[in-house]
Amino acid sequence: MSNLPIYNFIRKLPKCEHHVHLEGCLSPDLVFRLAKKNGITLPSDDAAYTTPSTLLASYEHFGCLDDFLRYYYIAVSVLIEASDFEALAYEYFSIAHSQGVHHAEVFFDPQTHTSRGISYDVVVSGFSAACERANRDFGMSTNLIMCFLRHLPSEAAHETFAEALKRNDFENGIVAGVGLDSSEVDFPPELFQEVYKLAAEKGIRRTGHAGEEGDPSYIRSGLDNLSLQRIDHGIRLVEDKELMKRVAEENIMLTMCPLSNLKLRCVNSIAELPVREFLEAGVPFSINCDDPAYFGGYTLENYFAIQKHFNLTVKEWVFIANAAINGSWISGKRKEELLSSVQKCVKEYTAEIQQPKTLETAVEVQA
């Protein structure tokens, strides 16, 4: 099926990523490689850590977000030096580039590392070096988004924010904005109202996870109390029609993560995601991979999953692609470049499907 013309179009479509956690790109192979390099002992009482293959297999059995987070926090313990963080991010950028991602806005969790004695400087210098390499090697534009862990006290978020301000990371463009992640339920957005207010006063961009496992009130609180400019996940927005209308009218982009929602059992099937409802309501959204090392797919696999279950038209894909570009935290010039690339892709696809099919192609389509 992935050989059908529409899938080739999706493969070539210029993509923007807005919801990927760099720590969630830590593949089992890289976990074992860095553990050996840095002398880190992985849990001996868990058979999952026998080999990279057994670790990968264990990722098939997540029951909820917290199940996943357990493996996630063990894996990041292998990240010690700046070169480790650079290797991790560059591995993601390489894969993303191969799948047609032209612009990537990536999350990182400094508190995960500073809490275990790794300095903020080490984390950011490694990730920013990978961003520079991605631009140089692939022509990819990138943004780092610094996330606060919502299961930690808000005071910890203030400390992390102060560290970034001290380094002038927002002013010099090394960090493009702030986000809010980790366990959602029982940690509503309003707990972080003060630090987000400080960010807003300084003109720093703001996003946050809401409406993944939490109900629509988490989304509303994020908008009202944190002045969020984007909503990460947001699939439960569909349960509140008035709020959905507001999000559409205010052009608040959602960053959806289909395979993640399936793996963490937020939905029982990709077909349950409110893709049609969002398209019909004019809610802008992008499609993203979240934590691809754990959830069985990077950006393209998520795009294909949506196509398989919703059979979108080229026009609908153009809406998604353009919404992703316009919702990106990039210059107007860069947006124009990417929008032009989408139109070029559409023209090439239109010309391709208007050509007479060869016998081989016809047989392939029938199959």
From Swiss-Prot:
Gene3D superfamilies reported for this sequence: Metal-dependent hydrolases
Residue intervals passing through the bilayer: none
Top-rank EC class of the record's enzyme: hydrolase
InterPro entries: A_deaminase_dom (IPR001365), ADE (IPR028892), Ado/ade_deaminase (IPR006330), Metal_Hydrolase (IPR032466)
Keywords attached to this entry: Cytoplasm, Hydrolase, Metal-binding, Nucleotide metabolism, Nucleus, Zinc
CDD domains: ADA
Any GO BP annotation: IMP salvage
Binding site for substrate: D291
Effect annotated for changing R150H: In dea2-1: Abolishes adenine deaminase activity
Cofactor binding, note field: Binds 1 zinc ion per subunit.
GO MF annotation list: adenine deaminase activity; zinc ion binding
pH dependency: Optimum pH is 6.7.
Protein name: Adenine deaminase
Cell compartments where the protein resides: Cytoplasm; Nucleus
Similarity-based family: Belongs to the metallo-dependent hydrolases superfamily. Adenosine and AMP deaminases family. Adenine deaminase type 2 subfamily.
Job of this protein: Catalyzes the hydrolytic deamination of adenine to hypoxanthine. Plays an important role in the purine salvage pathway and in nitrogen catabolism. Also exhibits a low activity towards N(6)-substituted adenines that are commonly known as the plant hormones cytokinins.
Pfam families, per the entry: A_deaminase
Residues annotated as the enzyme's active site: E212
Binding-site list for Zn(2+): H19, H21, H209, D290
